[in-house]
Amino acid sequence: MSTPLVSIVVPIYNAAPNLAGCIQSIRKQRYENLEILLVNDGSEDVSLPICDMYARIDPRITVINRPNSGVSATRNYAIEHAHGDYLQFVDSDDWLDRNATRLLVERALETDCDMVIARYCRVDGEKQTVHGFLSEGPCLSQRDLARHLLEEPASFYYGVMWNKLYRRSIIENHHIRCNEEMTWSEDFLFNLEYIRYANSFCALETPIYYYRKNNKSITATKVNLLNAVKVKTSLFPYYKQLYTDIGLYEQFKPQIYRYLVSTAEHS
């Protein structure tokens, strides 16, 4: 089996307490053909020196230091400087199972799919819970994935970037980027755009990513109702475009509207 280059992107902002563990989990991957992009987003702690220390001992690591501009701009800059056949994203508070990249790449190569979606563990203190929906099996078509997506439209499993493997050629050919004006659901918007241009999707039932619940993060706090409504309203055109492109918009329009309305009901 071939070993294509995988670019692992880590956006970093004031992540010193957990950063070494995150980087070590990437360095110790059993899949070794990696380009590791550590992108410091103007951290005010010792995150940058930690990155520089690891870059001195691992030639696969490239450290990029930028003025603070937000996670979306940081990811976009890394995407534009990545060289891998595939892209993988890791948040600096989290860590990977040692087999994470190997399993993602093996699944991608054996199925020739455009995206691999893996289960993950949510870590809350000493408690770990596995999250995910899809079962391993034949690749899903674009239409199949779109149907599954609306069963759990607000889930991290479909929405985030860090439990997935992406073909970089699709991202580059269609200039897919994170929306730098959004501070919530920017991952989901990126994925909706990617799904528009990808043809096949497969699942990995093994949990390969450990997501550390952070009570100070925007994803762990109660999002302001007005902002949540604004964000979901801005997502609507992308939903409509995706489901129109694949001929499912009229069929799934009620579910899409229900997802938008649920913000007001549950926020």
Spans of model-derived segments:
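N-proximal low-complexity "stem/linker" segments adjacent to membrane-targeting elements
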Residues: 1-27
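Acidic helix N-cap motif at the loop->helix transition within catalytic regions
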Residues: 20, 45-53, 95, 99
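Glycine-rich, basic loop-to-helix element that forms the pyrophosphate-binding segment
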Residues: 66-82, 95
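Short aromatic/hydrophobic "clamp" motif used to bind/position activated sugar donors
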Residues: 87
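C-terminal subregions of glycosyltransferases and related glycan-biosynthesis enzymes
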Residues: 208, 212-267
